[in-house]
C-alpha cells in the first residue's frame, strides 16, 4: 500500500524484476495526480501490457494485482459520524500488508497520521493480519541545516508537521511502537544506510553517475533523512523473519 504514490513506477519495476511474484499492489493519491499517471500508462504499450485489463476510468484503476485509488488520504482518518470510510477495492484484510510512505505523511498533522494508520490496522486490515510500515522522512530539525531547511520550505508555504514532532531516530521508533507495530520498530538515517547497506560496487556506480565531489555535503544531507520501519506479526511472523536481522542504527 503506497501512500501518495505520485508518479512512482515501483509496481512495474517489481513485475520486471520478479515476474512470478504474488503481489497485490495499491496506491493512494489525489485524483489530480492519478489522472496523468493513468493517462501515461495508457500511452505506453510497455506499461499497458502489464495490466490485467485496460483502465475504464481516467483517475482510478482496480484489478486483482494493481490498484490506483483516487483519494485524499485524509479521508481515511477517523470519519465523522454517519460518514463511511472510502472503499479500497481488492484490499484483502487477511493478507500480510506493507504500508509505504515516502515523504507523504510528513505533510499531515501527527494526530491525523495516527488516525490514518489506525484506520488501516484496525478497519481495512484485521487486527490479526501481519502488517508493517516503512517511512521515509526528514529528521534533525533543530540544528543549523535543519533550521535552514525548515525556513526555506516555509518561504514556499510548505510545512512538515511530523518533522518537529519526531525529530530523531528514537522518536521515530517510539512513533511506530505507538502506532501498534510492537514486534519491531527500527530506524536508520540515510548516511548510515549508504555506508552500511550499500555495496562498494554500487557506491562506485552511483559516484560515476552523479560526480560526487562534495562528499561532506552529501553526508550532511543524508544525515537529515531517515527510514523507519516497524511491524506487528499478528497470526504469522512473516515480517519478523524478513526484517528481524536488518541492521538498524544505534
Q: Where are the predicted features?
A:
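Active-site alpha-helical segments that house and flank conserved acidic catalytic motifs
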Residues: 7
Amino acid at each position: 500500500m503506497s501512500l501518495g504514490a505520485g508518479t512512482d513506477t515501483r509496481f512495474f519495476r517489481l513485475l520486471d524484476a520478479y515476474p512470478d511474484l504474488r503481489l497485490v499492489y495499491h496506491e493512494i493519491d489525489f485524483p489530480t495526480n492519478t489522472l496523468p499517471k493513468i493517462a501515461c500508462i495508457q500511452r505506453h504499450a510497455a506499461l499497458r501490457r502489464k495490466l490485467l485489463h485496460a483502465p475504464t476510468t481516467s483517475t482510478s484503476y482496480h484489478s486483482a494485482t494493481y490498484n490506483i485509488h483516487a483519494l485524499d488520504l485524509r479521508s481515511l482518518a477517523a470519519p465523522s459520524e454517519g460518514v463511511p470510510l472510502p472503499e479500497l477495492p481488492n484490499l484483502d484484510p487477511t493478507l500480510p500488508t506493507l504500508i509505504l510512505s515516502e515523504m507523504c505523511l510528513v505533510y499531515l498533522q501527527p494526530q491525523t497520521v495516527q488516525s490514518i494508520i489506525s484506520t488501516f490496522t484496525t478497519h481495512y486490515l484485521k487486527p490479526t493480519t501481519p502488517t508493517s510500515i516503512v517511512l521515509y522522512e526528514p529528521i534533525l530539525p533543530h540544528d543549523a541545516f535543519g533550521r535552514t531547511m525548515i525556513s526555506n520550505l516555509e518561504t514556499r508555504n510548505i510545512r512538515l508537521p511530523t518533522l518537529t514532532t519526531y525529530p530523531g531516530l528514537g522518536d521515530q521508533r517510539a512513533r511506530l511502537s505507538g502506532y501498534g507495530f510492537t514486534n519491531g520498530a527500527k530506524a536508520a538515517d540515510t548516511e548510515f544506510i549508504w555506508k552500511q547497506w550499500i555495496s562498494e560496487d554500487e557506491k562506485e556506480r552511483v559516484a560515476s553517475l552523479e560526480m560526487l565531489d562534495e562528499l561532506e555535503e552529501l553526508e550532511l544531507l543524508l544525515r537529515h533523512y531517515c527510514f523507519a520501519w516497524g511491524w506487528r506479526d499478528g497470526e504469522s511472523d512473516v515480517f519478523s523473519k524478513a526484517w528481524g536481522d536488518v541492521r538498524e542504527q544505534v
